[in-house]
Amino acid sequence: MAKATGRYNLISPKKDLEKGVVLSDLCNFLVSQTIQGWKVYWAGIEFDVTHKGMALLHRLKTNDFAPAWSMTRNLFPHLFQNPNSTIESPLWALRVILAAGIQDQLIDQSLIEPLAGALGLISDWLLTTNTNHFNMRTQRVKEQLSLKMLSLIRSNILKFINKLDALHVVNYNGLLSSIEIGTQNHTIIITRTNMGFLVELQEPDKSAMNRKKPGPAKFSLLHESTLKAFTQGSSTRMQSLILEFNSSLAI
């Protein structure tokens, strides 16, 4: 009697389903409060977001800082000395990083429509709103987004997180310390610091860096611990300490 088999399948349907991300996972940014901050669930990934470093960010912005921290303030004058810059929450920083990861994927890969358009919309939603749900109205997108495609998006976000982890602490021997991604309406800059990632969102022309007439900018800090669970970095605690002392950064 003939028997159906999946003998030559590389991934069994069961495993694919287990690892799969459904469209609703990409369109929901679920947040719950914890003692130290928040738990966030997005694209099948759970993030622990903490308040750590935020008090220091506010002190640098309001001139309430120790003289030893002046280098940090002078390194980012367009953030800390700009009357048109505003500090956002770490949840905002995570949203911007995830949006940047999607944009990075759109730049790196020739994704077919409607997938590219759908990802662009999800990226804009993360970047420009603080809502927890995005309503993907296009039925065609829902039909064509297979589990494999969604899982690919998730794995590429994790690859982007590892790209961030590979950055060096800013001001350390001139080594690469930032990732910059330009979209039609924004410039995203993510910089590695001692405490984690300084995330900034500027106008496309980066007018915030104009010293005479600085344009608007938003910024925040996402603590190192939030992304550490997803990285494959091999840096030891001792290497981290050396970087910390050599960089002389407050944040």
Swiss-Prot record:
GO terms for biological process: symbiont-mediated suppression of host innate immune response; viral process. Keywords: Host cell membrane, Host membrane, Host-virus interaction, Inhibition of host innate immune response by virus, Interferon antiviral system evasion, Membrane, Viral immunoevasion, Virion. InterPro entries: Filo_VP24. One of its GO terms (cellular component) is host cell plasma membrane. It is a peripheral membrane protein. The keyword 4Fe-4S does not apply. GO terms for molecular function: structural molecule activity. It is found in: Virion membrane; Host cell membrane; Host endomembrane system. It holds the Pfam family Filo_VP24. Prevents the establishment of cellular antiviral state by blocking the interferon-alpha/beta (IFN-alpha/beta) and IFN-gamma signaling pathways. Blocks the IFN-induced nuclear accumulation of host phosphorylated STAT1 by interacting with the STAT1-binding region of host importins. Alternatively also interacts directly with host STAT1 and may additionally inhibit its non-phosphorylated form. Plays a role in assembly of viral nucleocapsid and virion budding. May act as a minor matrix protein that plays a role in assembly of viral nucleocapsid and virion budding. Belongs to the filoviridae membrane-associated protein VP24 family. Interacts with host importins KPNA1, KPNA5 and KPNA6. Interacts with host STAT1. Interacts with host KEAP1; this interaction activates host transcription factor NRF2 by blocking its interaction with KEAP1. This is Membrane-associated protein VP24. It comes from Zaire ebolavirus (strain Gabon-94). The lineage of its organism: Viruses, Riboviria, Orthornavirae, Negarnaviricota, Haploviricotina.
